[in-house]
């Protein structure tokens, strides 16, 4: 499932993040690449230990924790600290798949990458190209979202970023280990939760059907979750 999650950051928060990011020191993007990704990757990135990356990353994680749609879709157990990249002048990232396990450098903190996320930090009309293209059995899905919006997709997906031919694309990217490992199970829970919320808004939280469906949701989560 590929999902657009709007408004993770407000426009004011995006501006604050960009003010810090634009004055930071960027390095070659292959600093975090696996062997396959390094062959395809041409961009720049903030080092993982950068104070700016930590400060802006903490703000993003705080925003994610307050966003009910993100929680419902991802059911996060662990979130890898957000990283940051930028593309301009034809820079691109060819087709690749993300590493299954991400290790935070200098620590023993590991994340199984069930989900990948990209949070856009530049408005789409400010640059040409730079589309995130995610492949699945139904074809190729493209994302180029407003600043502050996030796209969430299975980390097992082949994906690429098209060349940026005008302007600059700035984004944060990170991985999530979900409480529910299987993408199909997680998608089913998300669909069920979405319908429960809609029915609750219409009938009220004390409606017998709402209560019954909520019980089914939690029993399925209990069956499938690692916590």
UniProtKB/Swiss-Prot annotation:
All residue ranges annotated as the Fe2OG dioxygenase domain in the record: 78-178
Cofactor(s) the protein requires to work: Fe(2+); L-ascorbate
Keywords: Dioxygenase, Iron, Metal-binding, Oxidoreductase, Vitamin C
EC numbers: 1.14.11.-
InterPro entries xref list: Oxoglu/Fe-dep_dioxygenase_dom (IPR005123), PKHD_C (IPR041097), PKHD_hydroxylase (IPR023550), Pro_4_hyd_alph (IPR006620), Pro_4_hyd_alph_FE2OG_OXY (IPR044862)
SMART domains per record: P4Hc
A GO term, aspect molecular function: 2-oxoglutarate-dependent dioxygenase activity
Protein name, UniProt field: PKHD-type hydroxylase Bcen2424_4810
Species: Burkholderia cenocepacia (strain HI2424)
């Amino acid at each position: 499932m590929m999902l657009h999650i709007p408004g993770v950051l407000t426009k004011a928060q995006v501006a604050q993040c960009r003010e810090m990011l634009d004055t930071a020191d960027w390095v070659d993007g292959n600093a975090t690449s696996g062997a396959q990704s390094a062959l395809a990757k041409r961009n720049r990135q903030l080092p993982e230990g950068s104070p700016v990356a930590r400060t802006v990353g903490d703000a993003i994680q705080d925003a994610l924790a307050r966003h009910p749609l993100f929680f419902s879709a991802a059911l996060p157990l662990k979130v890898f600290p957000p990283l940051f990249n930028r593309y301009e002048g034809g820079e691109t990232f060819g087709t690749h798949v993300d590493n299954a396990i991400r290790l935070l450098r200098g620590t023993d903190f590991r994340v199984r990458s069930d989900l990948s996320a990209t949070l856009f930090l530049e408005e789409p009309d400010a640059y040409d190209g730079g589309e995130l293209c995610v492949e699945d059995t139904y074809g190729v899905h493209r994302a180029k979202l407003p600043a502050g919006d996030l796209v969430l997709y299975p980390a097992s997906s082949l994906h690429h970023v098209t060349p940026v031919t005008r302007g600059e694309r700035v984004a944060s990217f990170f991985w999530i280990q979900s409480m529910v490992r299987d993408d199909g199970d997680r998608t089913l829970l998300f669909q069920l939760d979405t319908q429960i919320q809609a029915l609750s808004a219409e009938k009220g939280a004390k409606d017998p059907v709402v209560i019954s469906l909520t019980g089914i949701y939690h029993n399925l989560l209990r069956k499938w979750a690692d916590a």
